[in-house]
Regions:
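Adenosine-phosphate binding glycine-rich loop
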Residues: 91-154
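Small/polar loops that bind or transfer phosphate-bearing groups
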Residues: 5, 17-20, 88-92, 113-114
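Single conserved hydrophobic/aromatic residue that forms the stacking wall/gate
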Residues: 1-9, 13
Length: 154
C-alpha cells in the first residue's frame, strides 16, 4: 500500500491496483483514494490484467511470488502483459533477477529489483536512530557490498 499511496498523490495518471483478492484491492484503493481525496487508484482483480488500459505503464510487483527458493514463480505469466509495460520493478531482491524481471527484460524493457529500496530503508532508519546523515558515496559503498554478498553482478 505504500507504493500506491506515494503514487496516488500525483495528478498525472490513474493507477490500477491488481490483487488476487478483489476485496483487498478495493479496501486498499478506497483507503488511498480517501487519504488523497481523489479516485486515482482503481482496484482490479489480477485475473483482469488484460483490461488495463493503454500501454507503456510501470509495473511494480510487490508480492513475495518469485522469492527464493521459488525463483521461477510469477504472478502473471502472459507475454502480452509484459509487452505493454514500459518498465518493471520487483520489490524482491533475492534472486536478483526474478522471473518477473526476466519477462520484462525479454521485451527489451528495463527491470529493477528491490535491493536499493531495502538499502535506503536501512539508511533512513540508521540516520533516524543515530541522528546522522549517510552520504550518497557511503550508501553506494554499502550497495556494492550488498551486491557482492548476494552475488549480484550488475
Amino acid at each position: 500500500s505504500t507504493l500506491s499511496s506515494s503514487s496516488a498523490a500525483s495528478d498525472v495518471y490513474k493507477r490500477q491496483l491488481l490483487n488476487r483478492t478483489v476485496d483487498k484491492a478495493e479496501a486498499i484503493a478506497q483507503a488511498v483514494n480517501a487519504h488523497f481525496n481523489n479516485d486515482k487508484v482503481i482496484p482490479m482483480n489480477i485475473a483482469d490484467y488484460a483490461d488495463i488500459p493503454g500501454e507503456d505503464y510501470v509495473v511494480i510487483q510487490t508480492t513475495s511470488v518469485g522469492l527464493h527458493p521459488n525463483d521461477e514463480a510469477v504472478v502473471i505469466d502472459d507475454e502480452a502483459f509484459y509487452k505493454k509495460a514500459a518498465v518493471g520493478v520487483d520489490i524482491i531482491y533475492n534472486p536478483a533477477n526474478t522471473k518477473f524481471m526476466k519477462l520484462i527484460k525479454a521485451q527489451g524493457k528495463n527491470a529493477y529489483n528491490g535491493l536499493k529500496m531495502l538499502l535506503y530503508q536501512g539508511v533512513s532508519a540508521y540516520e533516524l536512530w543515530n541522528d546522522c546523515k549517510i552520504t550518497k558515496e557511503e550508501a553506494d559503498e554499502v550497495y556494492k557490498c550488498l551486491q557482492k554478498e548476494l552475488g549480484i553482478d550488475e
